[in-house]
Design a protein with these regions (language model features):
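Substrate-recognition/cap regions that form aromatic- and gly/pro-loop-enriched pockets
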Residues: 196, 218-226, 234-236, 247, ...
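Extended terminal and domain-junction accessory segments
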Residues: 1-6, 82-218, 238, 259-265, ...
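Solvent-exposed beta-strand/loop surfaces of large extracellular or lumenal domains
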Residues: 67-94, 231-245
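Short acidic, flexible loop segments centered on an aromatic residue
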Residues: 56-73, 222-228
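Short strand-edge motifs at loop-to-beta-strand transitions and within beta-strands
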Residues: 40, 88, 96-100, 244, ...
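Short beta-strand elements of extracellular/lumenal beta-sandwich folds
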Residues: 46-53, 205-211
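Acidic-aromatic/histidine active-site loop/patch
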Residues: 1-49, 55-58, 180, 186
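Short solvent-exposed strand-capping/beta-turn motif centered on an Asx-Ser/Thr pair
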Residues: 55-60, 212-216
Length: 298
């Protein structure tokens, strides 16, 4: 994905480089439980404006969303409004959600909306059809084209429409992503769950978490029970999007901020299933919470 600062839009950026396979490889990708051999067809009207909500429900795979000849406006990240931003290619990490507004051309046609797997030549998607009965073009689930890795290109351009009130942090928690260690272990701050050492917060605090990722791949980091704002990427502060899942790419650093206003014990983990079950997990615990029932080994 590339950003054109003149046209102010996202599009494909093509690069030559060494192919790096992910540590888990699939044989197919699905959109609404269907492959591109028989994709879902959504009938629309010429000139109509539609909203498409994308949900990355995969256990592992991140995606590039490809609108083809159409252009969309990104309106929401993880259900939180952002200043609208245009493009034909968008990034979507595991557990994230994106809401796009797309206006169909006045000329009837068939318009595939594709989701390409990260570091993969597999794809899936749905089809918008404004020409009833028009023959579907062939859409191969697997191609000769491979994609690269997700990065900060998209989040660097996004601005929250309802940002957090300006406030200094009361509590800063460093989180160094760790792995892969022997026996396919992944962790946080060189520790591998289960252990009983939560990230402590107090009611009403402005909390910041500072992520660094020296691992060879990106990690979608998800905090339960809270929405946070991305406030810094690679040392550059900004008023970024509100989210509940942030993708921290290989070699990347970012800072998130949230207000601790939901007392309890909340899971915090990489949303790649194979990573959090191998140790990239902990909990955020309020000092006021009852921890007697929390059993990390269970």
């Amino acid at each position: 994905q590339g950003w054109d600062p003149v046209k102010e839009r996202f599009s494909w950026k093509r690069e030559a480089g060494q192919l790096m396979l992910p540590d888990v490889v699939y044989d197919a990708l699905l959109a609404n439980d269907r492959s591109l051999d028989a994709p879902q067809i959504i009938d629309v009207k010429p000139g109509e404006t539609v909203a498409i909500r994308w949900i990355a429900a995969s256990a592992f795979m991140n995606f590039f969303l490809d609108l083809g000849e159409l252009e969309g406006e990104l309106l929401r990240t993880d259900a939180n409004p952002v200043e609208p931003i245009r493009g034909s290619v968008f990034q979507l990490a595991v557990a994230q959600r994106l809401s796009l507004r797309i206006r169909l051309p006045d000329t009837p046609g068939v318009f595939p909306l594709l989701a390409w797997g990260e570091q993969s030549n597999l794809r899936c998607g749905v089809v918008l059809r404004s020409a009833p009965g028009q023959t579907m073009p062939p859409l191969a689930p697997q191609t000769e084209q491979w994609t690269g890795q997700l990065d900060f290109t998209q989040d660097q351009q996004l601005r929250a429409r309802r940002p957090l009130p300006s406030k200094a942090a009361d509590n800063t928690i460093p989180v160094a992503l760790t792995g892969p260690a022997p026996s396919y272990r992944w962790g946080l701050n060189d520790r591998f769950y289960p252990y009983r050492d939560p990230y402590w917060v107090e009611d009403g605090q402005r909390v910041e978490m500072l992520f660094s990722n020296p691992t060879p791949m990106g990690h979608p980091m998800h905090l339960h029970g809270h929405e946070f704002q991305v406030v810094e990427i690679d040392g550059q502060p900004f008023s970024g999007p509100m989210r509940d899942t942030v993708l921290v790419p290989k070699g990347g650093r970012c800072r998130i901020a949230f207000d601790a206003i939901h007392p309890g014990i909340w899971a915090f983990h990489c949303h790649i299933s194979y990573h959090h079950i191998r140790g990239m997990f902990n909990v955020l615990a309020y000092r006021s919470a009852d921890l007697s029932w929390w059993d990390p080994s269970g």
